[in-house]
């Protein structure tokens, strides 16, 4: 319980820092951060039904946590303490559509949210883990989404635009229904993700 609460505290501080320093050209991005800050400022109940589960890509988790920059050591240390308690998942909507290689090299975990380790009904906060040289095909969802790259270099695409390089500490915001794709280039990628808005509707492949 203590490790989960520390994670909640650290991401709360992290999102407050983004709110203070980012220039908001998108009002939904500002609203999203407000929702994250408000929700992680509250007392949250421990989910007694939360069960540990691993996926094949978890073979990269240790090195991905180790590669988190020192400036985010609070988050990486809390993840180190939580890593053996996490329920890693895959999106069932992708079954029989994405390749077997994708499912060997992608997974996400919800730490705060309706089904997270800490229960919160109106946001989802967790991790995305991608293996080496994996392509995550274009997909979209109604929820607002923010990715904060913790470790690894990757390429990200919005709509049909060119892929752009994203490095550790970069932030990527996806408005509702914006198609996006990503691919890794020789190293695993660990990212903090957050959802707000229509969080109970899963992502769908395009």
Language model: regions and residue ranges:
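A short, N-terminal "cap"/entry segment at the start of jelly-roll beta-barrel domains
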Residues: 8-121
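Conserved short histidine dyad/triad with adjacent acidic residue
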Residues: 107-114, 123-141, 162-163, 175-177
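Glycine- and acidic-residue-biased ligand/ion/polar-headgroup-sensing regions
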Residues: 131-132, 141-160
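Long, compositionally biased interface segments
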Residues: 202-205
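Ligand-binding loop in jelly-roll beta-barrel domains
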Residues: 176-200
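Short acidic-glycine-tyrosine-enriched beta hairpin
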Residues: 146, 159-179
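Intrinsically disordered, low-complexity terminal regions of plant proteins
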Residues: 1-6
């Amino acid at each position: 319980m203590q490790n989960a609460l520390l994670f909640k505290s650290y991401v709360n501080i992290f999102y407050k820092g983004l709110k203070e320093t980012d220039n908001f050209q998108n009002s939904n991005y500002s609203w999203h951060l407000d929702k994250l800050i408000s929700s992680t400022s509250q007392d949250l109940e421990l989910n007694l039904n939360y069960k540990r589960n691993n996926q094949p890509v978890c073979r990269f988790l240790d090195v991905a946590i180790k590669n988190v920059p020192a400036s985010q050591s609070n988050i990486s240390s809390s993840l180190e303490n939580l890593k053996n308690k996490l329920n890693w998942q895959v999106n069932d909507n992708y079954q029989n559509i994405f390749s077997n290689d994708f499912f060997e090299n992608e997974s996400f975990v919800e730490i705060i949210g309706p089904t997270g380790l800490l229960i919160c009904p109106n946001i989802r906060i967790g991790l995305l883990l991608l293996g080496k040289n994996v392509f995550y095909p274009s997909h979209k969802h109604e929820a607002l989404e923010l990715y904060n790259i913790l470790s690894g270099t990757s390429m990200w695409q919005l709509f049909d635009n060119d892929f752009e390089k994203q490095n550790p500490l970069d932030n990527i915001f996806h408005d509702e229904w914006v198609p996006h794709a990503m691919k890794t280039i020789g190293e695993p990628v660990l990212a903090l993700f957050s959802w707000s808005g229509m969080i109970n509707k899963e992502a769908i492949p395009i």
